[in-house]
Amino acid sequence: MSTFHFDLVSPEMVAFSGDVDQVDIPGAEGDFGVLAGHAPVVAVIRPGILTVTAGANKQKIVVLGGIAEVSDKGLTVLADVATPAPDVDLQDFAATIQTMEQQIPGKVGDELDRAIERLDHFKSIQHELNTTAMH
């Protein structure tokens, strides 16, 4: 399988930089996978789990939004937050979800819709992290 270069950058750090076989991205319009030779594209990333495959190794990284750009030079993801899944503090993440739930009643209209959508994404991440942690 052909490889391509992948950079995952957040404001705090370069979370990943190297050659990979595949990257699965939680896109705002739906999840998508990137392989070598992928057509150029720029996509918005929703909160979710990004999966990096390099050989037999898979690494899961929690991203909380951002932008992905595929070009002839490879894939670059500029993430608002990027944390390797094993480094996520599950109690802190649960507390964040609880705070988000408590803030829902004060929102209306489009703001309410966006808050519910973001909460759903966070709950999906939490579910996957809890499921993964058990295996």
UniProtKB/Swiss-Prot annotation:
Keywords: ATP synthesis, Cell inner membrane, Cell membrane, CF(1), Hydrogen ion transport, Ion transport, Membrane, Transport. Signal peptide: none annotated. SUPFAM superfamilies: Epsilon subunit of F1F0-ATP synthase N-terminal domain. Pfam families: ATP-synt_DE_N. One of its GO terms (molecular function) is proton-transporting ATP synthase activity, rotational mechanism. InterPro entries: ATP_synth_F1_dsu/esu, ATP_synth_F1_dsu/esu_N, ATPsynth_dsu/esu_N. It is a peripheral membrane protein. Disulfide bonds: none annotated. It is found in: Cell inner membrane. F-type ATPases have 2 components, CF(1) - the catalytic core - and CF(0) - the membrane proton channel. CF(1) has five subunits: alpha(3), beta(3), gamma(1), delta(1), epsilon(1). CF(0) has three main subunits: a, b and c. Belongs to the ATPase epsilon chain family. This is ATP synthase epsilon chain.
